[in-house]
UniProtKB/Swiss-Prot annotation:
Cited InterPro entries: DUF2122_RecB-nuclease-rel (IPR018665)
EC number(s) stated in the UniProt entry for this protein: 3.1.21.4
Family affiliation: To M.jannaschii MJ1199.
Recorded GO MF terms: DNA binding; endonuclease activity
Catalytic activity: Endonucleolytic cleavage of DNA to give specific double-stranded fragments with terminal 5'-phosphates
Origin superkingdom: Archaea
Key words of the record: DNA-binding, Endonuclease, Hydrolase, Nuclease, Restriction system
Protein's UniProt name: Putative type II restriction enzyme ApeKORF2002P
GO BP terms, alphabetized: DNA restriction-modification system
Signal peptide interval: none
Length: 156
């Protein structure tokens, strides 16, 4: 079964972070980006700018109030939560073994990691060979690239 990777940017207030995540996701060939719990500038300016980019490229942007809404509505086979300090598995150039179906990859849009309650039930992952938090866009670039190139075509 092929893997469909869908990035999720959760709990974000930065306009630039939303736009950068959209550019990154779409440039990797992904069709869908999900933004959950956007507030402040991200909600007022970042989401509209990312929507403009999505429409221009023929891609999708899904904006939802909570992470659980994305999980409930998109019915993923797996949820990966990017958590540098509590990772159970590491994602490297070979991707991540055992993934199939629809995979949501959740990146924290703010400085704190995902709250343990938000990551409940998810596979907690981080980047092989990287020590410490490098920020959500760098994390997304590496993890999404490894997942897409390491284990078949994961374009969503």
């Amino acid at each position: 079964m092929p893997v469909e990777v869908i990035p999720v940017l959760h709990n974000v207030s930065s306009v630039q972070r939303v736009v950068d995540m959209a550019r990154l996701s779409y440039s990797l060939g992904l069709d869908t980006l999900v933004v959950t719990k956007a507030y402040g500038g991200a909600a007022q300016s970042g989401v509209p700018e990312a929507m403009r980019l999505a429409l221009k490229l023929g891609k999708s942007l899904v904006v939802l109030p909570e992470l659980r809404d994305a999980v409930n509505l998109l019915s993923p086979t797996h949820v990966l939560a990017v958590t540098p300090s509590r990772a159970e598995r590491l994602v490297g150039p070979g991707g991540l073994e055992g993934l199939e179906g629809r995979v949501l990859v959740v990146f924290s849009g703010g400085e704190p990691e995902l709250d343990p309650s938000e990551a409940a039930g998810a596979i907690r992952v981080y980047i092989e060979g990287v020590e410490g938090k490098v920020g959500p866009i760098a994390e997304a670039a590496l993890i999404l690239y490894f997942l897409l190139r390491g284990g078949g075509d994961g374009r969503g």
